[in-house]
Each structure stands twice: as C-alpha cells, then as structure tokens.
C-alpha cells in the first residue's frame, strides 16, 4: 500500500529577506520559521514521514530545538537549486515508486490543516497528482521598461501555485532527472514537461510564502490567531 511522505527543501538562503541568516531560521513567535512549517505537516497523521533537505554545510539547524517526532528525518543533501534539493532528497528517501510525495515550501509556515486534508483527499486516487493553488483574483498588468503598463492581462483560467505539490515518488524522480531549464520553477512544471496534466486543488490565502520582511508580520498575526483559538 502506498504511503504519503512530505519533503521540505530547506537548503536555500532566502536572500530577499536581507537577513543575517537563511529565512527558514528567522525567529517567528519564539521559534524558527521552519519549526512552524514542520509542526503543520507533523499534525497530519496520514504523513508517514517528514523529510527536511538541508544544505550539506548548513550551520544553523543544530542551534535550535525541533519538534520531537519519529517521523521527522533530516537529509543534508541539498543542491544549488530547489529541483536539485528535491531530487537529491528523493534519491536518499528510499521511497517506493508509488508512494505519494508532498513537496512543501519551508517558508509556507501557516498551511491550514483543512487545505492539507483537501489535497490528500482529492489526489490520493488521482492518476497524476497535483497541487494546492488559488484562482487569480486581482487584475494583472504586464510592464514595459520604466514600470509602465504594457497591457492588461486576462486573469481568466490563471491560478497561483502553492504547496504542497503531491506526486508519486517514481513519477517525480523521472521528471526531475530530465534536463530542466529556468521555466521549471516547481514540481508541477517538471511533471508538465512529461506531457502530464497535474490537478489544481483549491488552496488557501493563509498558505502564503514568507518572502519579504512584511510577510513575517502577517505570519506572526496568523499564528497568533491560531494559538488564541486553541
């Protein structure tokens, strides 16, 4: 019987934060941002394993306390790109080809439990797999040089990709073993290069990615509301 496992690529530096450390280790409500991400995943009982892929020379991880759970595994096999980190993590995970792998951004620390449940419920019998995503709600503008509007782009049929992105381990390994160009920015786009069509599963606006300093403020507010409601 196939299992579900989560894989969190956490080998990046997060340079856009302008911080003194990789953003996954920034303090968020008294714990590293990554710790909140892992707690969200470990709260899902259907995840048999939660794998974190770190850079081989990571000097930050061991400085912090992490959730104590036998399902949590640390792999220091991260690569220069996200795709390399995910591929290396798959190679070292020893997962069966038909196991489901849920790749989740380290910086999406507010993943709502019902969104994760919805993803697994929707895709566990799907022939391809898919990802959490949200329909684009805002008007889109394409720019020219000098930040002038070149045109208004129709948002019809456009979605914002989120994570987790859920695919069979064998299929994902095959997709990531192929030469990839800059157009492949997530697992779903690699799967698309195989001629397959991932399914879009409605995500959640709270499942945002911490990218800029102001995102930390929003994440603190979301986590504070969650804690207040417990």
From Swiss-Prot:
Q: Give GO terms for biological process.
A: isopentenyl diphosphate biosynthetic process, methylerythritol 4-phosphate pathway
| UniProt-recorded name of the protein | 2-C-methyl-D-erythritol 4-phosphate cytidylyltransferase
User: What Gene3D superfamilies does this protein's entry cite?
Assistant: Spore Coat Polysaccharide Biosynthesis Protein SpsA, Chain A
Q: What class of enzyme is it?
A: transferase
Site, as annotated: Positions MEP for the nucleophilic attack: 155, 209
UniProt-annotated site: Transition state stabilizer, residues: 16, 23
Against Pfam families, the record matches this protein to:
IspD (PF01128)
Report the EC code(s) recorded for this entry: 2.7.7.60
Matching HAMAP family:
IspD
Kindly give the InterPro entries that the UniProt entry links to this protein: IspD (IPR001228), IspD/TarI (IPR034683), IspD/TarI_cytidylyltransf_bact (IPR050088), ISPD_synthase_CS (IPR018294), Nucleotide-diphossugar_trans (IPR029044)
What pathway is this protein said to act in by its record? Isoprenoid biosynthesis; isopentenyl diphosphate biosynthesis via DXP pathway; isopentenyl diphosphate from 1-deoxy-D-xylulose 5-phosphate: step 2/6
Reactions that this protein is recorded to catalyse: 2-C-methyl-D-erythritol 4-phosphate + CTP + H(+) = 4-CDP-2-C-methyl-D-erythritol + diphosphate
* Lipoprotein among keywords: no
Taxonomic superkingdom: Bacteria
Q: Which organism is it from?
A: Laribacter hongkongensis (strain HLHK9)
- Tell whether Transferase is among the UniProt keywords: yes
Gene this protein is translated from: ispD
Family affiliation? Belongs to the IspD/TarI cytidylyltransferase family. IspD subfamily.
Task: Give the protein's function.
Answer: Catalyzes the formation of 4-diphosphocytidyl-2-C-methyl-D-erythritol from CTP and 2-C-methyl-D-erythritol 4-phosphate (MEP).
Q: Which GO terms describe its molecular function?
A: 2-C-methyl-D-erythritol 4-phosphate cytidylyltransferase activity
Keywords, alphabetical: Isoprene biosynthesis, Nucleotidyltransferase, Transferase
């Amino acid at each position: 019987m196939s299992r579900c496992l989560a894989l969190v690529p956490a080998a990046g530096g997060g340079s856009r934060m302008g911080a003194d450390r990789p953003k996954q280790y920034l303090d968020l409500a008294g714990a590293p941002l990554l710790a909140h991400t892992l707690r969200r995943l470990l709260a899902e009982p259907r995840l048999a394993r939660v794998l974190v892929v770190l850079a081989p020379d990571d000097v930050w991880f061991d400085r912090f306390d992490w959730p104590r759970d036998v399902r949590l595994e640390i792999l220091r096999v991260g690569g220069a790109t996200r795709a390399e980190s995910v591929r290396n993590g798959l190679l070292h995970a020893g997962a069966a080809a038909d196991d489901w792998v849920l790749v989740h951004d380290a910086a999406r620390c507010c993943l709502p439990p019902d969104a994760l449940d919805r993803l697994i419920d929707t895709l566990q019998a799907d022939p391809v797999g898919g990802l959490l995503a949200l329909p684009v709600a805002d008007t889109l503008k394409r720019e020219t040089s000098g930040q002038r509007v070149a045109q208004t782009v129709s948002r019809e049929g456009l979605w914002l990709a989120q994570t987790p992105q859920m695919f069979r381990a064998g299929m994902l390994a095959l997709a990531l073993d192929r030469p990839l160009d800059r157009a492949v920015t997530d697992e779903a786009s690699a799967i698309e290069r195989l001629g397959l069509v991932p399914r879009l599963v409605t995500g959640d606006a709270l499942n945002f990615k911490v990218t800029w300093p102001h995102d930390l403020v929003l994440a603190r507010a979301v986590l504070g509301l969650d804690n207040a409601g417990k």
